[in-house]
Amino acid sequence: MLFRSQEYERSWDNLTKPYPGIPEMLEACLAHGLKLAVFSNKPHPFTQACVERFFPAVPFSHVVGQGDRFPKKPDPSGAIWIASQITSQSHRIAYVGDTNTDMKTATGANLFAIGVAWGFRDIPEIREAGAQEICHTADQLKNLLVSRRA
C-alpha cells in the first residue's frame, strides 16, 4: 500500500484533468461576481496542490482540505465556517458536489445543494441525499449559479 501511495503522490496529475467546461464555468461565475471556494475530504496539502495545478488563475476565497481544523464531511462544520466567511446569508450559498456526502454536508450546513451528474455517484443517490437541483453539464451549472445570484 505504501508503494501505491508513493506512486500516486508522484504521478497523480498525469491523467487527471478538470471535467469538460469547468474552467470556463469558473471564469463565467467570477465574471458575474460570484465568490468561489473549495472544500474537500482529501488531505489539505493535496487539495491545495490540485487547485494550484488545475486552476492557478482562479481566485478561490478559501481552499480547505481535510486536516485537524474540521471533521470530515458530511460533518457540516467546515462548510458552515467557509460560508460564514463569505456572507452572513448562508442560504444564498450554493454547495456543488458529486457525492451523497457532499449533499449531506450542504443540507447540514443549510446551503443550497446542487448535485452534478458527471461525478462519482449516480443521480438517484445524490438526489436522495438532499440535492435540490441536479446539473448535467458545466454550462447548466453556470446558468443555475448565475441565476441564483440575482
Describe the predicted segments one by one:
Residues 133-137:
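Short acidic-hydrophobic, aromatic-tinged amphipathic segments that line or gate anion-handling sites
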Residues 1-2:
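Short, small-residue-biased leader/transition segments that mark boundaries at the very start
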Residues 117:
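Nucleotide-sugar donor-binding loop of glycosyltransferases
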Residues 10-38, 44-49, 76:
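Short, acidic loop-to-helix structural element flanking the phosphoryl-transfer center
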Residues 142-150:
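Short amphipathic alpha-helix with an adjacent loop that forms part of the alpha/beta core around
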Residues 14-17, 43-96, 100-109, 123-127:
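Substrate-recognition "cap/lid" segment bordering the active-site pocket of phosphatases
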